Amino acid sequence: YAPNVYMNDPLRRYVVFGCLFEGDRLESKRPRGWAGMQSIPRVVFLQENELLIQPAHECYMLRKECLGAYAKQEKMDAKGQQIEIELSYRPSEKSVLQIVLQASPDGEERTVFTLDYGKNDLFLDRSHSTVYSDITKEDIHAPIVYEERSVQLRIFVDHSSIEIFYDDRLTMSARIFPGREDSVENSVKVSDDVSMLVGRIYRLACETEI
């Protein structure tokens, strides 16, 4: 919604700041006195007549320590509310990747992002993202097409926001509002037919560390 686009930096990039709305009921917004937030900076560019989008290079500066790394046949997990998940992998035609975000230990709260190449579908399931009843929990879908090559995936989580960048071709953004203080668990699981090249979870800097 109403993105702000700038092209005035020395690299002559088109830098976009999107607007992320929470989508909950109006009466629940009034006590807060605010609504919506801006996305991380994104760069849009043309490559072989295709419009691509990726996080601005400066977002790498937010990375602090690595909280988890993927090992073959194991689940990658880490705790945190400000994280970046970086994956580079080679899928097959039926591969499935499941990424659980901001989950409580008992699973009462959880947001689940699934990449299902057999169904050509990206799916963000927010149905259990919060225990609150006045928050939008609609599912978000986007189509994908299997290609026999490696894929890059980056996911940014910042407390109530999730921003997903799929292979520089597609973005998916959403708001979530976990109500439990222990909803800080994040994990990545992949089917056996996925060849994982890179898998890491980073803690992102808070405002006092920038």
Language-model-derived ranges and their functions:
Residues 1-210:
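Beta-rich accessory regions
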